[in-house]
């Protein structure tokens, strides 16, 4: 390669770098304008926009019945509805109930009978499998919307704190690492690989504080979630802490 060819190559590289820098500058300018627009938008405190709470009239609204859930639980409905509504088979659902039973069983009081473990888990799975509508879940299981909210939070906390560390964990021994490496090479053709890393955005409601940190590149408020999977498509690590405005390139592979 002579001097002229080297000079042309260097010039082409400099031109490409200049184009990339220009593109980044344009993107930053658009982003700054968007952030400025949202920063100037007035936001009322949550206590001002919160509606006055109405006095409770019923434990459960008249007309709400758990008939659909009772039919499904008693095997009267079509068995395929388990997979369609809960994203798992009936045997898997029963196994999940047994593992969470020590943490979700409630004591009976003089007021009314508490929700059993099966109903609590069914409410949570139905909520997570759909678009997350409290009213729809409440109508399907014959409970109040506030009951759906408390149940979903309680079950999710039990799953993440009690079952999460057991099922979602990184390899801790050389034998486990070797098994992952050989599995990726055998089934997917990737050498020296123990996991596939990617991220996704989970949309959230606009926070009252530091809301611009959660505004992603699509103009929606979200949490940036990073996941690591093995060759069997099972999660081995999940990191849920990055606000939506953080770019994927800035996230470090935590604990990897």
Each model region followed by its residue ranges:
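Short connector loops/turns at beta-strand edges and beta->alpha or beta->beta junctions
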Residues: 101, 128-133
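Short alpha-helical segments in extracytoplasmic peptidoglycan/chitin-binding modules
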Residues: 89, 123, 137
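Short, well-ordered secondary-structure "scaffold" segments embedded in the functional core
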Residues: 2-5, 133-256
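Short, amphipathic alpha-helical "recognition" segments used to contact nucleic acids or chromatin
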Residues: 117-130
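Alpha-helical interaction elements in eukaryotic regulators
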Residues: 30, 68, 78, 82, ...
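Charged, often Cys/His-bearing segments associated with DNA-binding zinc-finger transcription factors
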Residues: 1-107, 161-164
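Short, surface-exposed loop/turn segments at secondary-structure junctions
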Residues: 107-115
